Regions:
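Structural motif
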Residues: 77-80
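Short active-site-adjacent structural elements
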Residues: 162-164, 188-189, 207-213
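N-terminal short beta-loop-beta anion/metal-coordinating cradle
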Residues: 7-74
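Mid-sequence, gly/pro-rich, charge-dense loop/helix-turn segments that line enzyme active sites
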Residues: 88-174
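Short, Lys/Arg-enriched N-terminal segments with co-localized hydrophobic residues
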Residues: 1-5
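Regulatory input/activation interfaces that engage signals or partners
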Residues: 143, 198, 203-220
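Short glycine-rich, acidic/polar surface loops and turns
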Residues: 181-199
């Protein structure tokens, strides 16, 4: 994929929760509801492109299954993962946007066999978002007035981080981490394995600390 906007005809957007995809769904024309097993997706048109919105559900397995399905079923030119995240980067506040330049699992440990923390055997230690898609995301995010837009490392794991101890543990493995959430690394790994360009875009909903659950609910 050369990053030529005209060549992109089909875009898949994966979101874990209804609140994370409903604005896009309301903006689409000719929307069709598609279900596969227990998963839901919406196919439609937006800005002259074919869009497929997938409601993945929460967590890495849900994210991987639904991303794999949408790639197999709709052959998208790229995959966008959108949603919320706990902000760990310095100075990040609720509403700021983090573009996942790189993405890693924070709860994978195969260090006994010489892999780095977070690395799945035989795979890269981090997965990189497509550079052209990062540029497009950076431009698109400028519409959020008052929100800072930053790029960096987003880490994922199957737990909602809501304590300073949890944050400290993640930082001990990933010094330059910007945000933490529960799906991005699985989506990135799926796209890497199936050779589809992707970008991860997350809005900060909380600071992954003791007030995270309250802040997260308010943000949604």
């Amino acid at each position: 994929w050369k990053g030529n906007e005209m060549s992109v005809q089909t875009i898949a957007v994966v979101g874990a929760m209804e609140q994370e995809i409903e604005l896009l769904r309301e903006s689409m024309a000719n929307v069709k509801h598609v279900s596969f097993g227990k998963f839901s997706a919406y196919e439609g048109e937006l800005a002259g492109k074919r869009m497929v919105l997938v409601l993945s559900g929460i967590g890495k397995v849900n994210a991987a299954v639904s991303t794999s399905w949408v790639i197999h079923q709709f052959a998208p030119d790229c995959v966008i993962n959108t949603g919320s995240a706990g902000g760990l980067g310095k100075g990040l506040k609720v509403g700021d946007v983090v573009i996942g330049e790189t993405v890693a699992h924070h709860d994978v440990d195969v260090t006994a066999f010489g892999y780095v923390w977070g690395q799945v055997p035989q795979l890269p230690a981090v997965f990189a978002s497509d550079k052209n898609l990062i540029c497009q995301a950076e431009k698109a995010a400028q519409v959020f007035e008052g929100a800072a837009v930053t790029q960096g490392l987003i880490v994922s794991g199957d737990r909602f981080v809501h304590s300073s101890e949890g944050v400290a543990e993640i930082r001990s493995h990933f010094l330059d981490v910007k945000a933490v959430e529960m799906e991005a690394a699985a989506i990135a790994q799926t796209c890497y394995q199936l050779e589809v360009p992707f970008v991860i875009i997350r809005a900060v909903s909380d600071s992954a600390d003791e007030k995270a659950d309250i802040s997260f609910e308010e943000f949604l």
